[in-house]
Amino acid sequence: ETWGKDEYEEFAKDFLYADGKLEKTSKSLPSLSWYRILLERETWEPYAVYYQKLLSGIKCFPVVSDKKEKEGISFEDSWGMSRSYGGKRLHEGTDLMPPKNQRDTFAVVSVCDGVVEKIGWLELGGYRIGIRSKTGTYFYYAHLSSYAEGMKQGKTVKAGELLGYMGDSGYGAEGTVGQFPVHLHFGIYFYENGKEISVNPYEVLLFLENKKLIYSYF
């Protein structure tokens, strides 16, 4: 699926209209609402550029699917929902749930070509890895159980390359596991004038659903 310049512009307007929480209807590119008609070009144009960079750089779904499992990887639109661990905050990502609650089983891969910018433990994210794409988008993968061999800061990765395995690490001191079910927290960030902007990954994951890598886990 490819989009033209006008479609990226509509995508950006939808993003602003919904305070960053893009709806499933965004891809259908509905007629402009009065709100979007009144948006000044300088307000939405930067976001159109960001989405064009984001979508032109991603190539595959972030979790390798099991060809024998009918249910596969599931996810819901949970971006912006309330979280309480570590203080009241909003969920800045989408949680991808495996068909079986088994850590160190389901492979997590890079959705794009890029460079490992961050890696290691975070209290909230557990064992996490952050990839900066060639077009400047930052992709955040959290709660891993382990990393792929040789994965380190500064390493160049290709789309589809193994980053590590889905787990349940986080919410405590380094090595903490079992505070929640096994899953991958997947986040996307833009940077505008030095400010980090969290983007709802849900629509992007829908975009990537037909770009899954397949493997026989069981």
Predicted segments — roles?
Residues 1-4:
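Long amphipathic alpha-helical coiled-coil/heptad-repeat bundle
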Residues 11-127, 159, 172, 213-218:
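Surface-exposed, glycine-biased beta-strand/turn segments
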Residues 158, 165, 179-218:
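Acidic, glycine-rich catalytic/binding loops that coordinate metals and/or anionic ligands
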